[in-house]
């Protein structure tokens, strides 16, 4: 569908109007309208600075600021709904301001280009979204921490290669995801420091001849510093790439946990039970309860990866300074933000009220395997037997047990002592699952005291940053 072309600020340079199909092709208003609140805020700061610097009169500055506030109100109430002929959010706002104020509205763009304008808008937007996502990460961590604190002494099989390896405290397993989320929170905090740099005043690429005060607009908008180079200011998309990379890692961590929930909820595992609040059924199989939430989180992860790769490809061959290619930086960014926010919310709800762990099933799983085999080798090594010799002996024992349909706990003391004279009656205590977990009390290990201390540290961090 095409739309009739309307005059643009640059129309006097051209003899004929833009082709209607190219109007649609060029337009970004369909998605960059998401920046309108930030565009209005940035424009108000710019107008205030222009008036303070006597580039426009005080009365004109006040009229522009008030006009922009009226546009904000009109947008929020649905009265201002620009079409594709506006091309982008910046022209849409300027056109409406001119309708309201006449020639005074045309003065807003003095000493400014859309190039530094869009950079400012995007940073203001992303700064807010980063703050929101960091708060979401804290909410997610609180829910995981609550689950971990409830299951400090609940055991779960630990896996390598998706094969039973060693038993763990369930709290220790969840703590691993708490630490991943902490790195995500810190990573976004680091990004925010670099994000908080103002490009406003850089102009199209070379600065401006007007006596503007870039530090003033930066202060009005809450930026901590300004770009030192005007070319860099309008060309830089590092912060968007950094955000998409950080968002990708958040999604990696959510997706890994989602995958585990999917496995745990299966009949083959039955480690968790999904509540009706966070599961759906089948249109044909009445017995089904499907883990849609973690499956969607797992599926949505790829789209965030794609947005990161797409932006890197857009940027890799661009000469300085602004190029129309950079219009392609926004749709992926907006979608990645929405995806991360929705997935964090969904996973928080899932762990708050959407699943329950099944301690009896978990305990039975831990009891019915050879994940205590390493502890038999450690038992002998602690009594002077070289570890590799002990390791090989236990490997033979496991093979024999498998052939006979036994577990290690089923061997009699006589059978143990026939294997090696160092075995005594306390071998049964050493290989009991609770003791196996408790004994791994090295710093950062799954031992109950270590996990209790680790969770206390997490709670302290969360309370300090609430």
Swiss-Prot record:
GO terms for molecular function: argininosuccinate lyase activity. GO terms for cellular component: cytosol. It comes from Synechococcus elongatus (strain ATCC 33912 / PCC 7942 / FACHB-805). The keyword Cytoplasm applies. SUPFAM superfamilies: L-aspartase-like. PROSITE patterns: FUMARATE_LYASES. Belongs to the lyase 1 family. Argininosuccinate lyase subfamily. GO terms for biological process: arginine biosynthetic process via ornithine; L-arginine biosynthetic process. It is an enzyme of class 4 (lyase). Its EC number is 4.3.2.1. The lineage of its organism: Bacteria, Bacillati, Cyanobacteriota, Cyanophyceae, Synechococcales. The keyword Amino-acid biosynthesis applies. HAMAP family: Arg_succ_lyase. Its main location: cytoplasm. Pathway: Amino-acid biosynthesis; L-arginine biosynthesis; L-arginine from L-ornithine and carbamoyl phosphate: step 3/3. This is Argininosuccinate lyase. It is found in: Cytoplasm. It comes from the Bacteria. Pfam families: ASL_C2 (PF14698), Lyase_1 (PF00206). Keywords: Amino-acid biosynthesis, Arginine biosynthesis, Cytoplasm, Lyase. It catalyses: 2-(N(omega)-L-arginino)succinate = fumarate + L-arginine.
